[in-house]
Amino acid sequence: MSIYPRLTALAWYWNRLRCMSAGEVGHRAHQKVMSRLQKFGLAIVGGVPPADLSRVARSFVGRDSRVTRDPYIRAPAGILAGEMKVFNLDCQFGATPNWSRDPKTGTIAPLRFGKTLNYRDESVVGDIKYLWEPNRHLHLVTLAQAYHQSGEQRYLDALRHQLESWLDQCPYLLGPNWTSSLELAIRLINWSIAWQLIGGVGSSMFAGPDGAQFRERWLRSIYQHMHFIRGHFSRYSSANNHLIGELSGLFVGCVTWPFWPDTVKWQQVAKDGLEHEALLQNAADGVNREQAISYQQFVLDFLLLAGLAGRENDDAFSQPYWQRIESMLEFIASVMDVNGNVPMIGDADDGYAVRLSQEAEFCPYRSLLATGAVLFKRGDFKVKAGQLDDKTRWLLGAASDKTYADMPANNVTLPVRREFREGGYFVLGSEFETSRELRVIADAGPLGYLSIAAHGHADALAFTLSVGGREILIDPGTYAYHTQKKWRDYFRGTAAHNTVTVDGENQSEIGGNFLWLRKANARCEVWESGTEHDRFVGSHDGYRRLDDPVIHRREILLEKAGRRIVVTDTLECAGQHQAECRWHFSEACEVWLEGKVLYARNNGSVVSLRLVEPALKFELHNGEEDLPCGWVSRSFDVKIPSVTAVVSFAVQGRTSLVTEIVCSY
C-alpha cells in the first residue's frame, strides 16, 4: 500500500491544526473524547421520551399555495420509477435505495460509528457529496407536494416506503448519514416540510395501529436528529454556513415537532444562535462573509425558513434579524445583471436547503428576491425578480400573489447599492437595467470567513463584466469539492480568475480542499462613482510572502460615454518576476484575434481588448487538461471548455500592464 495518502492526510491535519486557536484545540479534543464515549454507548439518546402529540404546531409551508398542479403531479414520476437525478448524474436507485451507497462511484460506505467515519476518504465513502445529496431528502418534499396537490395515495405510499427504508438502513449514530450535523439539519427541514404537506400529526399515513407505529418510529428518529445536532454544532473555525444550517434545522424541527420538553430549550438555543450568527456571518452591507454567492442564497434559505417558522408559531425573530436578511437580498439585487445573471464568485456545490419549485425556468436568486419583495414590500426587488415564483407561493401562501401584483415597481432606483465596502464588492457600470447595460463587479474583499476561509477563492482584484445582460468576462465557477484535487485547486486558484498571478503562484496558500493558510489581504483604496465615470482602485498583499515581495494594485476606470474600461495593473517589487494576467470568457462568447486586438461576441454584445504595450500579446487557451486553462463550470462536477486569454509579462521594479476594453454594444 502506498504511503502517499497517509502522508497527504497527515499534511492536512497539520495544516488544519495551524488554523486553530488554543480554545479550538481543546474543543476538538473534547469532541473526540465524546465521540469515543458515544461509540461505546455513553452520552447518547437512550430511550426517547414519549411524544405529547397534543402540542400541535401551525404549518408555515403550503398554506393554500396557488400553484399550477400539473408540474407537481408529474414531478415524482422518476422517483416512483426508482430514478433520481443527483447533481447532473441520472441515477438508478431502484424501488428501495441503498442509502449508504455513493451513486457516482458505487462505493458503499460502512455502517460504522458515524462520528469517527472518515468521510473525506474516497476509498471508504466514494464521493461524499453524491452520497449525502439524496440523503438530504429534498425529493421527499416532491412526493409530499404531489400528494398535497392530488390526494393520490401512491405518493403517500412512496413517501412512507422511502422513509421506512432510510430508518431501516441508517440506525442512530451509524454510517455516513450520522457524521455531519448540517446533513441531519437539512434532512430535518425537508422532513418538516413533507410532514406539513401530508397533513401533520393527523395525516392518513398514520391511520390505524400500523400507521401509528410508523409515526412513533419516525418521531423517534426526529428526536434523535435534534439531540445529535444540539450536541454537535460546528464551532470555532468551522462555525460558518454549517452552523447557521444546523441552528435552522434544529429550530424548524423544534417548531414542527414540539412534542418533548427538550424541544422548548433546544428551540431557544437555536433561536438565540440564529439571531447571533445572522449578524455575525453576514456583513451589515449584506455580503455573506464566506465570500461566495452560492452560499449567500444557501444561508438566506436557512434564515428565511427559520424566520417564517417562528413567525407562524408565536416565536418571531427580531427586527435586526429581518433587516440583515433584507440587506443580503439587496446585495443579490445589486450584483445581478439585467438578464438575471449572477457572478459565480467563490464556492458553489449546487446544494440547496429545499426544492419547492418545479418551474422549468426557476432561478434561486430571483426566487429569493420575489420572496423578499413580498416580505419587505420592495418594488426594486420585484423588478429584479420578474415573475412571482412557486417557491415563494409555497412559503408565503395565496396572499403573496395579490401582494406581488399590487406592488408598484416604477420609480425604483437600481442597482440598489453600488458600494459594499465591508463585504469588499463594488458595482461599476452605466445604463443599468437597459439593453445597453454595462455591469462590472470588482472584488476587493477578504479571502473567506474565519481562519480556514473554507469557501473563498483566491480572486483578489478580479472582476466580471456583462454587457446588455450578456456575460463576457466571468468567474469560471467551482466544479469540484471533496475529490479531484487538481481541479479543486485550479478552479479556486488565482489562475482561474480575471486577475494577475506572479511566478505561477496563488495569491493565498492552499492548505486543503477547504483550507487556506497564508491569505492575501485585499482592500479598496479608491471608489468613485459619478455621471461621467466610475473608478475603483484596490490592492492586495498576497505576494508579499515571496522572497522578493510584490504588491499588486489594480485600477479600473469605466468611462461611461465612451463605454470604455481601462484596467491598469501595477506590480511593485525590488527584483524580477514573471507575471500573467488572465481573462476568462463566457462559454457563450465567440472569441478571436485580429492582429493584437482581442474580440469577444456574445449574442450581439461585442467587446474588444487591447494591450497598450505593443510588445505584449494575448495567447488563447481552450479546454486544456494537463495544465488546466480555459474552462467554465456552471454546475457541480460539470465543466466545459471556454476561452481564456493569457498575457505574460516580465516584472522588474515597478511595472504596469494597461488593458483597454471597449464595449461596442
Locate predicted features.
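Boundary detector for helix-to-coil junctions that initiate low-complexity/charged tails
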Residues: 1-29
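Beta-strand-rich N-terminal accessory domains
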Residues: 16-20, 28, 32, 36, ...
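Extended, charge-enriched "interface" segments that sit outside catalytic cores
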Residues: 27-122, 129-133
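Beta-sandwich/jelly-roll carbohydrate-recognition scaffolds of carbohydrate-active enzymes
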Residues: 98-103, 108, 414-417, 424, ...
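Aromatic-lined, polymer-binding surfaces characteristic
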Residues: 110-111, 117-121, 127-326, 333-341
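CBM-like, beta-strand-rich accessory domains located in the C-terminal region of large
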Residues: 185, 348-349, 355-361, 374-395, ...
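A residue-level signal for conserved active-site and pocket-lining positions in enzyme catalytic cores
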Residues: 250, 332, 428, 569, ...
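Carbohydrate-active enzyme catalytic cores, enriched for enzymes
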Residues: 287, 291-473, 525-530, 651
